[in-house]
Amino acid sequence: MPPNFFQKPETALKRAHELISVGKEMDALETLHDTIKSKRHKQWTKTHEAIMLKHMELCVSLRRPHMAKDALFQYKTLTQQVAIKSLETVIQRFLELAQQKTEEAQKTSIEKVEEIDDLDQADAPENLLLSAVSGDAAQDRMDRTVLSPWLRFLWDSYRNCLDLLRNTAVVEQLYHRIARQSFEFCAKYQRRTEFRKLCDNLRLHLTQIQKHQHLAHVVKLTSAESLTLMQDTRLIQLDTAIQMELWQEAYRSAEDVHGMMQLSKDKDERMVKPASYVNYYDKLALVFWKAGNRLFHAAALLQKYIIYKDMKKTFSMEEAMDQATRVLLATLAIPDGADNPSDLTRHLDIEEQHIANMRLLSNLLRLPVAPTRAGILKEITRLNLPDVAVESARTLYRLLECNFAPLRLASQIQAELTKVTELNRAEYNQYVEALKGVTATKIIKQISVIYDTLSIGRIQKVIPFYNGDELERFLVDIAKHRYVKARIDHRGGSIHFGAADAALSGFFDLEVSDGFGGEAEQVAVEDIRNHLQSMYNNLRDAVQVLDYEKIKRAATDDLKRHAEIYLYHKDADYERILLRRKKIESYKETSERQKLEKCQQAQAEANRKEEQRRAEEMRRLEQENIEKEKLRRLAEQEEIDRKVRAEKMKKIQATPIYQAIVKDHGEEAFQNMDPDSVLREQRDRLDEQRREQQARLQQQEKKFDHLIRAYHLQEMVARKAISDNFAVKAPQNHDSYEKRRVENAIKDHENAVAVYERMQKVRKDPDAAAFLESVKKARADDFNKKIRGFGRRNCVMRNENVLKNRHELPKEGAEERMASAREVAEQTRRDEQEKERRAVRESQRPSKREIVENSEMDSDWRKSAQPTQPRTISSKPFGERFVEGERYRESGAVTASEADSGPWVRGNVTGSQRQQDVPIRNIERPAVPSRFSNREQARGEADSTTNWRKGQVAQRDRDQSVGKQPLMEKRGEPSGAQLHDVKAVATPSPADAGPWRRGMIVARDQADSSQRTSAATPTTQPWRPSRLRQADGAPVNGAPSGRILEGSGSNEPSIGKWNRSIQRTGDSHGAQSFRGISQHQQRRGAADDDRNWRQK
């Protein structure tokens, strides 16, 4: 079980040594592994290297490749920036130990087999049975038992190290060194499968290097040193493939070498050394020879000879002779038709694939075109290779390419091949059999030109290379490949040349000259033809001399007969010739005209196609330019993004999140992250911290809730005590306050009376009156002029506003325009009437008001609370009422009369005084014309029914329905009480008294139903908070009295949680009724009082 606590590296190493000393190597390995894998190690020390060396020893001894891989990857992350030499030391030590263990296992396996072989007694029955079943030797079985596990471990070690070091520039040399050791391992132990996998891994690593060239730490393909290392490694890979005779893998390795050479050549042509090319062509020639491709084998040797000659400044004669002889023999060994597609390729109709393969192989040889046998021979002749080669090779070249002696050719070639064999050169002897086949093919082709039929025995004498069966198989093969057209006749024991049937002839034939090969042989054939022609001419001359007379007589008769025939047909022939000439001329004219028309059409079609091609080319170039521009912009954007990401990552390294990520995941994980990933990691960490903080807060909140609840319980006791104390002291405070208020009111009244008396004296003074009159007269003209100007400007602005509003609004009908005009005229008329009414009210205002004698008229619990003057609610729209309020405020306060200075009714109208004698003061102003008259009229009607708050009483009919019976019973009314209409009563009724009416508005009907009064508390009550006074209906800071709780407004509907101002009417007998409130609202209001006791 690995420890779950952190250990220092020195402690872990000491602990591992202790465990090893007691034989617990696995526990020691786990201890060291946990120490290396710990994320708390951020700085490399020398102790870490000692831990890794011991860790590698334990992994090798216990055969734990996966643990070694994990530890090496972690150690690479720890050391790749500071101690890369330490990483190399650990890896080399690890591979050395694995190799030693493998070699020891191999020796152990061999020794065990030798011990078994040395025993005198017979084999055990199980060994005999196993050998009979498997067919393997004892050494093979022992290797599988003892050596195979260590071979597998060593292979895993090489592969893991290569994966660890791939695509990293700082350990590139170590990577290639391990790759070459891997090739040696595969060659030494003949691990063919592992060699293929190793080659595939190296190709995959190269692909990844090409893909990630934009990164900073990767291997750069622009580096000369890197390309040289890769090229040398690929050449060793090719050598190993040839050594292990894996020819398919050798061909793929040759492609890899060619690709690396092309990369090096693109970087610098001088980077690839000529010796590398010589080695490359030598190995490639061997691969082609093993593949049976003699044409490209000879081409590779020729390329090697050319480069070798240019490379060697002092090209010795022996080296030149050796290279030239090999090239010459390889070229002569090329069979006829080697550059043509095979029969299978022709039958499957895949000639294009054959051409593509030829082009690919030519690219491997760095040839612009595919090589041919004739082209190679011309190049050999140009380089004068036959003269440089050995004598036997030069003779073979002359016999095969220059002479025409099919009957003697085989014996001559056999003699020269014997000389070549006597040279005892393996690279020469490999061409002997191929040269025999080429010689036999050439003899058969030459014989087929001269003879039609030849006996099989004669052919066996001419071609001594094969016996009967081999010769017959050879003839069938060359006939199948259509080198010659031959048919074997076993009955007659002969061979017939030439196709017996046209259907048996192939769809193509080689040229006749292909049977002879060179120009010298063609000259020999011409000599034979000239000899036969001269013999024919001589024989013909001898016949003419012997039969001269007979020939002369026959010639004379023929001449006479031809003359007669000519004379007979002369005229007809002449006419026929003339007619034919005319036809020919007509045909020529017609054909020329048609040819001209066709030429013109062809020219027009060519011009059209050329124009179309140019247009397509222009479109293609434009598209390419667009794509290139798009790619350029994309590359620029990617570069900008990369720089921005790099800058962000650089800034992030200065933040605490960098330390947190490195602490948790390591430096390598941070290097592989982008800014978005870092921000996402930071956001996740913040979310985690927020969740932890929220959990702690929730835990504290639970504790805090209990504490607050305890506070509240104690607070309730303290508040009850304060409330009881306040209830005891409230009457005393009220009496003292009332006493001070009465005294202050008396003093204010006395001062006001004194002022009034002084003003009366001034008013009665004739000098003052004369002065006021003179000032009025002096300013009368200016005053009247300003009044008239103001009126004119007002009318003009009003008309302009009406016209402007008319144009802005959608055009309505003519009736609406007329209605607007009428509203303007009506508004003007109302203004005039308002001025007249104001003058009348000023003249009819009483001198003083009656003073309330005592406070017993107020039935409210507040004692001496003053009733306020009722206000008549207007049914006009809100906009008009707002304008009226502005005008009313601008008009100024009314001068207080003597009656206004009383202590109880100052500024108010008493409820007990009837108002029949004096008209109600109306503060209404004429309405301002509105653009939405209909809508505001509806709103005004709604206001007239809901604007009963703030100490106002709504005008309602006396006949409207009253509250229901259960509501009366709930409020303490008798269950059988009858509802009656309210009568005009000047004094308060008994129903108005009682503590349950606290803060409610009381409305009583007067003689006129439009005049009502409302009770209110005094304006000044310092011992009550303003909030409670406002809630109970008392005026605050001059505001009208009324029951207005929090949340209610003057224009809101009369339903809701806080609208508890109710209208109550009663008669003289104490019958009580409630209007406009439901039972549910009463219950909810009572509950609100109970719930909000702390607010009050």
UniProtKB/Swiss-Prot annotation:
Coiled-coil positions: 591-643, 677-761, 811-839
Record InterPro entries: EIF3A, eIF3a_PCI_TPR-like, PCI_dom
Residues in PCI domain copies: 323-502
Subcellular location field: Cytoplasm
GO CC terms: eukaryotic 43S preinitiation complex; eukaryotic 48S preinitiation complex; eukaryotic translation initiation factor 3 complex, eIF3e; eukaryotic translation initiation factor 3 complex, eIF3m; multi-eIF complex
Residue ranges, compositional bias (Polar residues): 865-875, 1008-1023
Protein name, UniProt field: Eukaryotic translation initiation factor 3 subunit A
Source species: Brugia malayi (Filarial nematode worm)
